[in-house]
A protein has these predicted regions:
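Hydrophobic "lid"/C-terminal helical patch
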Residues: 27, 122, 126
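ATP-dependent NMP and nucleoside kinases share a basic, alpha-helical "lid"
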Residues: 2-15, 27-84, 90
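Conserved alpha-helical scaffold flanking the Walker A/P-loop in AAA+ ATPase domains
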Residues: 19-29, 95
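Conserved amphipathic alpha-helical interaction elements at protein-protein interfaces in regulatory
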Residues: 29-32, 128, 132
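Flexible, glycine- and charge-enriched loops at secondary-structure boundaries
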Residues: 12-20, 112
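Small-molecule kinase domains that catalyze NTP-dependent phosphoryl transfer to phosphate-bearing small molecules
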Residues: 65-68, 72-120, 129-138
Length: 138
């Protein structure tokens, strides 16, 4: 999304709100036309998440959680390195706050679970809620 629909936006709170608003608009448009949507993005403010929840249907908040040091270690784009050097202002977790979700529907700890374990847990939760069909054993 950052390379297309939201390329004009930075990392200020206002720009992050616009980013989420645009993504939500597209997801709602797709959903109205029978397309299921899974949106993955950094949403650092509880108020923004609450707004999306209030204005969409079948919304599930999945908190993919890891301590900041682990996130920095995993940063393949070097964004955190730039933010720590002061090259990117208003960067989540560095020079701008991250408000952890108060009550996420699904919570995975990727510093304690493997990618496969985290994915299996999320899929299992979606199956339990009837949002995706239960996978047949192989």
């Amino acid at each position: 999304m950052r390379e297309s629909l939201t390329r004009d936006l930075g990392f200020s709170k206002e720009d992050r709100e616009k980013n989420i608003e645009r993504i939500t608009f597209v997801a709602k448009l797709l959903s109205r036309n029978g397309v299921g949507c899974i949106c993955s993005f950094i949403s650092p403010y509880q108020s923004i998440r609450d707004n999306v929840r209030a204005n969409t249907t079948n919304f599930l908040e999945v908190f993919v959680d890891a301590p900041l040091d682990v996130v920095i270690e995993r940063d393949v784009k070097g964004m955190y390195k730039k933010a720590l050097a002061g090259e990117i202002p208003n960067f989540t977790g560095i020079s701008d706050p991250f408000e952890a979700p108060e009550n996420p529907d699904i919570h995975v700890r990727t510093d304690k679970q493997t990618v496969a374990e985290s994915a299996a847990y999320i899929i299992g939760e979606l199956e339990k809620r009837g949002l995706i069909p239960v996978a047949e054993p192989a």
